[in-house]
UniProtKB/Swiss-Prot annotation:
Segments crossing the lipid bilayer: none
One of the record's GO cellular component terms: cytosolic large ribosomal subunit
Entry's Gene Ontology BP terms: translation
Descriptive protein name: Large ribosomal subunit protein eL18
Species annotation: Diaphorina citri (Asian citrus psyllid)
Length: 188
């Protein structure tokens, strides 16, 4: 009699290539695969892994956040590297001179960086300039910044839960009666 082995945990779920069929992304993957293999650099390994990621795991990053991170001591003159999109922040009046490398830069952010005397480079240019990631600062946007993330966590209503409930409307009759008002049963 044979033993039925559980193969439930055999497969390690991780991406080995991007889901997207974008030819330019595939070329970048080819380039960083080569660099990861030939240079013993952790930087290239991280870039390659992030190129495989879904759009949700490559959140956009605002100029203001990049500026804040680049203002730290010892980071002057370095290249800010973002495997994702750089977006503009209209709350910031002036931006300093920056050298950034990203997959995408929105039109407004692009014009502001260039107007400040900065430079925007692509990942293939970065590979020539810093094949091992020397003089670069690798950053990423906040992954839990999406509205959907507010609904994740312990059920809304349980003690110490800050999870947002899926409510049809914010009116008086919607989750604002029993347990919320003394006139309706009790108030917690």
């Amino acid at each position: 009699m044979g033993v039925d082995i559980c193969h439930k945990y055999d497969r390690r779920v991780r991406r080995t290539k991007p889901k997207s069929k974008d030819v330019y992304l595939e070329l970048l993957v080819k380039l960083y695969r080569f660099l990861t293999r030939r240079t013993n650099s952790k930087f290239n390994k991280i870039i390659l892994k992030r190129l495989f990621m879904s759009k949700i795991n490559r959140p956009p990053m605002a100029i203001s956040k990049i500026v804040r991170f680049m203002k730290k001591p010892t980071r002057e003159g370095r290249v800010a590297v973002i495997v994702g999109t750089i977006v503009d922040d209209p709350r910031m009046w002036t931006i300093p001179k920056l050298t950034v490398c990203a997959l995408r830069v929105t039109d407004k952010a692009r014009s502001r960086i260039l107007k400040a005397g900065g430079e925007i480079i692509t990942f293939d240019q970065l590979a020539l300039r810093a094949p091992t990631g020397k003089n670069t600062v690798l950053m990423q946007g906040k992954r839990t910044g999406r509205e959907a993330n507010k609904h994740f966590g312990p059920a809304p209503g349980v003690p110490h839960s800050h999870t947002k409930a899926h409510v049809r409307s914010k009116g008086r009759q919607f989750e604002r009666a029993r347990g919320r008002r003394t006139s309706k049963g009790y108030k917690k």
